[in-house]
């Protein structure tokens, strides 16, 4: 995207029944010191309202562990966003957030009661995800539900690693960014209903 680096973009939102959908991913050992990179994005009303991309503090020894770290951080963000939106009246009270994860091993480790002898040092994260994503006592709902999603539909992929131009365009379209080809804020307000960023 070198040729477009100076083109500003806006985020577009539209009326939608989506009341909170999140995607999380991890790029295993992609940094120079073999640390993995976590990526997370949360969508509301057709556009992203929260996102993150950061190098993990721990060195993971497998893709599964790096994905579990990313999933645990996403659950923390889901808890915060859900409480905020409920307090603002922007989403129904008691409805779990939806988190999309593409790694089946991480999902099994996070949601199963099985004991994983080689993952004891990740047990706290495992327990945190399980506690917040499984049905609680009768009448209570979990913070979020985790859904296994095919890798090609993982919308946080662009937040974990560099993509080819074609894949980046797919990611860009997925997060509903639109080129801003006008000079004034007034024109911006006339062409999009909910601009949240310009430069």
Where on the chain are the PLM-derived regions?
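Structured nucleic-acid-interacting core domains from mobile-element enzymes and related host factors
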Residues: 1-26, 90
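Conserved helix-loop functional segments at active or binding sites
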Residues: 3-7, 48-51, 80, 84-87
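Eukaryotic intrinsically disordered and solvent-exposed regulatory patches
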Residues: 6-10, 27-29, 57, 84-85
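Beta-strand cores of modular interaction/reader domains in eukaryotic scaffold and signaling proteins
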Residues: 12, 23, 43, 100, ...
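Short gly/pro-enriched beta-turn/loop segments at secondary-structure junctions
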Residues: 15-17, 35-37, 92-94
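RNase H-like nuclease module associated with reverse transcription
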Residues: 19, 54-199
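RNase H-like nuclease fold core
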Residues: 19-64
């Amino acid at each position: 995207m070198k040729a477009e680096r100076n083109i500003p973009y806006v985020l577009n939102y539209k009326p939608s029944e989506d009341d909170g959908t999140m995607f999380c991913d991890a790029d295993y050992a992609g940094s120079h010191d073999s640390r993995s990179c976590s990526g997370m994005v949360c969508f509301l009303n057709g556009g992203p309202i929260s996102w993150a991309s950061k190098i993990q503090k721990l060195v993971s020894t497998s893709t599964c562990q790096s994905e579990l770290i990313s999933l645990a951080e996403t659950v923390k963000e889901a808890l915060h966003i859900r409480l905020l939106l409920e307090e603002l009246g922007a989403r129904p009270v008691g409805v779990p957030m939806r988190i999309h994860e593409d790694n089946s091993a991480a999902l099994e480790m996070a949601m199963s009661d099985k004991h994983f002898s080689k993952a004891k040092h990740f047990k706290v994260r495992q327990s945190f995800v399980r506690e917040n994503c499984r049905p609680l006592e009768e009448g209570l709902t979990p913070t979020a539900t985790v859904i296994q999603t095919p890798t090609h539909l993982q919308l946080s992929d662009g937040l974990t690693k560099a993509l080819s131009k074609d894949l980046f365009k797919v990611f860009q379209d997925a997060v509903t960014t639109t080129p801003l080809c006008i000079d004034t804020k007034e024109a911006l307000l006339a062409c999009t209903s909910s601009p949240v960023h310009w430069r």
